[in-house]
Amino acid sequence: MRPEKRSFSIQGHRTSISIERAFWLALKQAAAEDDTTLADLISSIDKARGEAGLSSAVRVWLLKRLQERAAQVTANTK
């Protein structure tokens, strides 16, 4: 799996993110579920990332989202 690079404008400046296709698909799905644009979702991740690189922050954000959803499903089945 090779990372795919895409560019966005975030807070008035252009930036690029290189993540694997599976992460792009998950990110697009998350944006659709949250009724927001991909650029706005990436911007919100960017604002909360601290010193981590943006690509890493996106991957970690997606992992945390998946873990939270799995925990909700587990809690609802008990």
Annotate the PLM regions.
Residues E68-K78:
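Short, charged, intrinsically disordered terminal tails
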Residues K5, S9-L62:
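Amphipathic, hydrophobic secondary-structure cores in small proteins
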